[in-house]
Amino acid sequence: MYIFLQQYWWLVVSLLGAILVFLLFVQGGNSLLFCLGKTEEHRKMMVNSTGRKWEFTFTTLVTFGGAFFASFPLFYSTSFGGAYWLWMIILFSFVLQAVSYEFQSKAGNLLGKKTYRTFLVINGVVGPVLLGGAVATFFTGSDFYINKANMTDTIMPVISHWGNGWHGLDALTNIWNVILGLAVFFLARVLGSLYFINNIDDKELTDKCRRAVRNNTVLFLVFFLAFVIRTLVSDGFAVNPDTQEIYMQPYKYLTNFIEMPVVLALFLIGVVLVLFGIGKTLLKKTFDKGIWFTGIGTVLTVLSLLLIAGYNNTAYYPSYTDLQSSLTLANSCSSEFTLKTMAYVSILVPFVIAYIFYAWHSIDRHKITEKEMDEGGHSY
């Protein structure tokens, strides 16, 4: 039962992470604000389009972190407590986004509308790149070590220690972390462009968005394929199920796909959906539903990658400083009682998702138009 609960909560956390990557279309759209929005009217439509969804992304980010903390507290204390500069910059950029939406159109703001929109662009770049880089460490490893004997130390009962003074920023010195960060960034821009096509009724702007889809897709595929191929052919961090010893296994993540055919099927279906949504949007000028195909494909693809990082006797948060300090589902999770209690609460998740879909549908009943922006009402 305990093993089932560990795997169940890794599935929940992975699903939240996958949904978060999809919702980064808000950041991707904002990063294009000055690239696509050459007029004030276009920029206002873009800001109001993403402005109606930014709370979904922010809430999912917080929920993802909360679920990770509750189910795998040792990861939370190790990563959030050790790599705190990386996570603080990510969180600060999202707070900057929230402030920008709320204050850019308020009368008498001292910084001016353009400054707040620049903050949105900063979040649109920093958020996806650093989140992608943080997730990449699940496959490349981090610089930390753990000494559980310190739990008995009444003066310094700290069991997780970061191995350098960069506290997370050192992740950006690994080229493969940067590559996945860039892949997530360009994917977010693709998703943002597809979202604008679906959400804004302005031919000139949506034509620019289709060109942005094409250009950013090329860059996304280059970085994404490079990271995936490298990950599948490299050694992975395996766990001996009997002794819990962690060791390097050739082709570990490829082996995980082969030994978990359902996860492999999810990955392949996800990739096909991503490409279908992009391809049909580019080939058929009247097609505006690409965000849904590519969005669902993104969730399935990211979910499958996170599952191979933690399932099948794999260390999901490896340490290259001390291999035996690497975190696994078994050595970093909460107690069985805690996981079981939270599992009962998680039954409510489908109802929350249903409410989100209902709210989304209500907000997007009509596409955003220039006329709507000119008429006033609530706008950013």
Predicted feature locations:
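N-terminal signal-anchor module of multipass membrane proteins
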Residues: 1-58, 62-65
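Short, membrane-exposed interhelical loops at transmembrane-helix boundaries
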Residues: 246-251, 318-338
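Juxtamembrane helix-loop boundaries in multi-pass membrane proteins
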Residues: 42-62, 87, 113-127, 206-220, ...
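Alpha-helical transmembrane segments
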Residues: 7-21, 81-94, 125, 171-187, ...
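Membrane-interfacial helix termini and the short, flexible loops that connect transmembrane helices
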Residues: 29-43, 71-76, 98-119, 196-209, ...
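Long, contiguous internal "core" modules enriched in hydrophobic/ aromatic residues
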Residues: 107-287, 304
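C-terminal functional modules
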Residues: 332, 337-380
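Transmembrane-helix bundle segments that line or gate the permeation/cavity pathway
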Residues: 23-31, 59-107, 123-151, 183-188, ...
